[in-house]
Amino acid sequence: MRGNTALMSTLKRFGITTGATAAAASKASVIFLIKNETPKTVTIPTPIGLRLEISVGNYSRKESEFCASAKKFSGDNPDILDGLEIIACSGRSNSQTITITAEEGVGTITRPGLKGDVGDKSISPIAKQMIIDAVKEVVSSGVYVKLYVPKGEELAKNTMNPLVGVEGGISILGTTGIEYPVSDEDYIEHIKSEACVVKSTGHKTLVLAPGNTSFKFAREIYGDKVIKIGDNVGSSLKVAEELGFSQVILVSLPGKLVKVAAGMLNTHSKFGDARLETLTFSSVVAGISLEKIQKIVKSLSISEGLSYLTDEERQKVMKVVSDRALEKLKRVSKLKLGVVVISEDGKIMAKSGEV
């Protein structure tokens, strides 16, 4: 029994993203609209094929609209948005589609380079599709859904949104619907377990992917050699050495890799930043014009900074970044090392080392 208790104490609770929360509230409101039912929970589909059962409630009617809400659950991630209520109000329309809009409490994009145009509400394409897919399990067309976040504007002031160019509320995000506790120190044990599985299949190369998007595209290139590491770049290198791998390849989006290029082997924001400084330096080395460098310096995010460059210029800059990241990794590891930079849509932007 003691052994089981010790094992249970190491398990981590996963959470749900704001996108999944909004999808659950939206599905509940449409069930209320179409069927006049008020379930206590709903199940929603996710982009990775899993289904999530999420508590819903707070049903109400507002003229011809039917409303319901769900609360975000962040699991064991420290998150200011834990418990945040997202309200969805739905109504009938003459449209042959399902329309999703965001109202008070959802932020507005004010800078280029983010997932949407300037002036749009900050709902990522994947999260929006997840909401639509959830609603389609009730009705295929002819409804609209409006999203409200009562405390969104207030809480967003304490998030990264104002720093990246989203004003007036939170963002509705999520690539999988599930929030993984990837920045917790205990997650290193999970990394070790995943790496052991890769090692047991006979692979001598371990591929590291910080997040969901990089993991997805890295799997398309390297198959089952890939593990997800969150912010733990340095610790993952040590794990690879301890387990006897001969090569490690880091596959990352630009936002994480510029931190590694700056010498950060744990990329969590509590340990530092230096993203735009690194991007600016790399742009100078790559020969980018002064006019564009001045725009990069004033950017609020890596995505915005890169949006001012042509495709060719982005590749040149990312080559500098990947070379510097490789240099930093070589300082702490004697393994054969490689770095691959990929874009949000999975295109390879640059490579360095042995990949």
Swiss-Prot record:
A Pfam family that the UniProt record links to this protein: CbiD
EC number: 2.1.1.195
Matching HAMAP family: CbiD
Reaction(s) catalysed (UniProt annotation): Co-precorrin-5B + S-adenosyl-L-methionine = Co-precorrin-6A + S-adenosyl-L-homocysteine
Gene responsible for this protein: cbiD
Lineage: Archaea, Thermoproteota, Thermoprotei, Sulfolobales, Sulfolobaceae
UniProt enzyme class: transferase
Pathways involved: Cofactor biosynthesis; adenosylcobalamin biosynthesis; cob(II)yrinate a,c-diamide from sirohydrochlorin (anaerobic route): step 6/10
Protein name according to UniProt: Cobalt-precorrin-5B C(1)-methyltransferase
Recorded family membership: Belongs to the CbiD family.
